[in-house]
Design a protein with these regions (language model features):
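Bacterial N-terminal signal peptides that target proteins for export
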Residues: 1-8
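Short beta-strand-centered segments that line the small-molecule binding cleft or hinge
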Residues: 113
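N-terminal secretory/targeting leader peptides
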Residues: 20-110, 118-321
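Sec/Tat signal peptide C-region and signal peptidase I cleavage site
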Residues: 13-19
């Protein structure tokens, strides 16, 4: 005859199934990228800390949503959590572009300070859109990749120049280059087909996309350190019990510290790999540096006009740190 314990067993199994929460985490970069590896570690830490109650699945390389779609997906709870490049959304609100203002924060120490100065306003902005910021991690400093040698900004005239955010589109425009919108997941193909001849990005993305197979020159301009941010849908977060929320926040704090360290530690390694694979890694000429700085000043002025008193307060706070 059936055991009288069976109903209890079924109830226990059903209860554990109901208690388990599953989140999807779309990310735009390859599984081998340090940001993605950090996300996977974050998900594993959450799984372990919650005893399997919260399972986060990382979908790398824009396999679930393309880079520009991830924020909207989290906002609409199509994905409960996601990783975004903040500056992708600078047209939506200038605050998302504060970390790509050219030559404002060009080192990890400076980027940390700018992150700290802008975090309260960023928290508030995301909260107004139904999201919570869990953590940020900076990319290595941005340099200029080119198929041909560049001595001055005029050498970029007419060149197909990848733009991935409003700042890079504006730079292309001011240098007389031809802006082409290409996300990181499509960059390898764009180089192979000749759709792009020059771009600004980190040594990390250059290495991930094997830029050295198509591009000869990397100018180490150290223009800015853009940030990725991991955001969560506020309602999805609020639906977790307190212990699970605390586990997520602790794992996020650990991921932020680990991610920033990894980014800084790997900066020189990425440039060495580009060199080993035949690229010339060079400082920009004095003329090019001066021209870049001029463009940077214009972009900062433009940003301050759009960002208003809130933007000025952030840069003032950053300047005092």
């Amino acid at each position: 005859k059936p055991s009288r314990f069976l109903p209890l067993l079924f109830a226990a199994v059903a209860g554990s199934a109901l208690a388990q929460v599953k989140w999807d985490l779309p990310a735009a970069y390859p599984a081998s990228n340090f940001h993605t590896e950090n996300l996977v570690q974050f998900a594993a830490d959450v799984d372990r800390a919650t005893g399997g109650k919260l399972k986060i699945t990382v979908h790398a390389n824009a396999s679930l949503f393309k880079a520009p779609e991830i924020k909207r997906a989290v906002q609409g709870n199509q994905a409960q959590i996601g990783e975004i490049l903040l500056s992708n959304f600078a047209n939506e609100h200038p605050l998302y572009g504060v970390d790509v203002l050219p030559f404002v924060a060009t080192s990890y120490v400076a980027a940390h300070k700018l992150d700290k100065a802008s975090r309260p306003a960023l928290d508030k902005l995301l909260a107004s859109q139904g999201m919570k910021l869990l953590y940020t991690v900076a990319w290595p400093p941005q340099g200029l990749y080119s198929k041909k040698p560049l001595n001055a900004a005029s050498d970029l005239k007419g060149v197909k120049f990848r733009s991935y955010n409003p700042a890079t589109a504006k730079i292309a425009e001011m240098f007389g280059a031809q802006p082409v919108t290409i996300q990181a997941a499509d960059l390898s193909q764009a180089m192979a087909t000749g759709a792009v001849e020059s771009f600004i990005t980190s040594g990390s993305t250059g290495y991930d996309t094997k830029a050295y197979e198509h591009i000869r020159y990397f100018y180490d301009t150290q223009a800015w350190l853009p940030k990725n941010a991991v955001i969560v849908n506020q309602k999805a977060f609020d639906a977790l019990d307190k212990a699970t929320q605390d586990a997520v926040l602790k794992a996020a704090a650990d991921a932020e510290a680990r991610g920033w360290k990894s980014s800084e530690d790997k900066t020189a390694w990425y440039l060495d790999q580009l060199k080993k694979n035949g690229m010339q890694v060079l400082p920009p000429s004095a003329q090019m540096s001066a021209e870049f700085k001029k463009v940077g000043d214009v972009l900062v002025d433009d940003w301050l006009k759009k960002a208003g008193p809130e933007g000025k307060a952030i840069l003032d706070a950053y300047g005092k740190m």
